């Protein structure tokens, strides 16, 4: 009697089909988790600047992301370097900026770029401070290819 050695062609094709189906399901889920993780990472990196901003404002200064402006007096207020460069060494943040409104601090922004996933590149995450010192988080996804609200942290608002 002849004994079978190995797998038949149909068995191998079934295994390959199962692997293909699993990969088709897993890849989009993986990309979603990566996008969420990258947004959360920048959320916490940028959120760490809130303490420095509060300290600078408490001393009557204006935060800046340009180290060359540190100590410069502008409109009778001293600019102080925030510790976050315009072009940080982050592999996710492309640019960082400070938003002023009538020479008053309003927000700190970070734009996704560099090694961020393509669907979130161009999105801008901002921490906005009101006159009472309350902070809110905003994500402007208008320049991003695909950035659904499910990617954003619970405390952020998408605009």
Swiss-Prot record:
Propeptide stretch(es), residue numbers: 1-6
Record membrane topology: Single-pass membrane protein
Gene3D superfamilies: Glycoprotein, Type 4 Pilin
Subcellular location as annotated: Fimbrium; Membrane
InterPro entries reported in the protein's UniProt record: N_methyl_site (IPR012902), Pilin (IPR001082), Pilin-like (IPR045584), T4P/T2SS_Core (IPR050470)
Keywords: Disulfide bond, Fimbrium, Membrane, Methylation, Transmembrane, Transmembrane helix
Keyword Membrane (UniProt): yes
Superkingdom assignment: Bacteria
Coiled coil: none
GO biological process: cell adhesion
Family recorded in the similarity comment: Belongs to the N-Me-Phe pilin family.
Protein name as it appears in the record: Fimbrial protein EcpB
């Amino acid at each position: 009697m002849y004994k079978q050695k190995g797998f038949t062609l149909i068995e191998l094709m079934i295994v390959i089909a199962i692997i293909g189906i699993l990969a088709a399901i897993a890849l989009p889920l993986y990309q979603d988790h990566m996008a969420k993780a990258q947004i959360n990472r920048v959320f916490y990196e940028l959120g760490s600047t809130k303490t420095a901003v509060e300290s600078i404002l408490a001393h009557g200064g204006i935060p800046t992301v340009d180290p060359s402006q540190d100590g410069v007096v502008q409109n009778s207020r001293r600019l102080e370097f925030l510790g976050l460069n315009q072009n940080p060494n982050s592999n996710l943040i492309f640019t960082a900026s400070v938003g002023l409104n009538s020479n008053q601090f309003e927000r700190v922004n970070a734009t996704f770029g560099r090694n961020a996933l393509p669907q979130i590149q161009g999105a801008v995450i901002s921490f906005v401070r009101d006159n009472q010192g309350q902070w809110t988080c905003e994500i402007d996804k208008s320049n991003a290819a695909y950035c659904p609200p499910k990617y954003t942290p619970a405390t952020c608002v998408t605009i």
